[in-house]
Amino acid sequence: MLFYSFFKTLIDTEVTVELKNDMSIRGILKSVDQFLNVKLENISVVDASKYPHMAAVKDLFIRGSVVRYVHMSSAYVDTILLADACRRDLANNKRQ
């Protein structure tokens, strides 16, 4: 649930989602769920010439299992806080 909480803080920011089929899609993150499925609005495909069928698409739902990476501006990430949260989450999971 750690990364679910992290991605919830990125709502209404611009992200680039790289899919397992090598397509990269840039858009505004509108929602995320516990399976890390994401909804993007105002999308654009990074290499539009390779994926012309995506030119007319403006809003997109992406299943979490097809996501390889999510890129965002480093201004949105407090790496020290995130590393600390990961350590606490790991410690809590070991106790259970």
UniProtKB/Swiss-Prot annotation:
| InterPro entries reported for this sequence | LSM_dom_sf (IPR010920), Sm (IPR047575), Sm_dom_euk/arc (IPR001163), U6_snRNA_Lsm2 (IPR016654)
Q: Which SUPFAM superfamilies match?
A: Sm-like ribonucleoproteins (SSF50182)
| Single biological process term from Gene Ontology | mRNA splicing, via spliceosome
Q: GO terms for molecular function, please?
A: U2 snRNA binding
Q: Which UniProt key words apply to this protein? A: Cytoplasm, mRNA processing, mRNA splicing, Nucleus, Ribonucleoprotein, RNA-binding, Spliceosome
Family note? Belongs to the snRNP Sm proteins family.
Q: What is the role of this chain?
A: Component of LSm protein complexes, which are involved in RNA processing and may function in a chaperone-like manner. Component of the cytoplasmic LSM1-LSM7 complex which is involved in mRNA degradation by activating the decapping step. The LSM1-LSM7 complex loads onto the 3'-end of single stranded RNA. Component of the nuclear LSM2-LSM8 complex, which is involved in spliceosome assembly. The LSM2-LSM8 complex plays a role in the biogenesis of the spliceosomal U4/U6-U5 tri-snRNP complex by accelerating prp24-mediated annealing of U4/U6 di-snRNA.
Official protein name in the record: LSM complex subunit lsm2
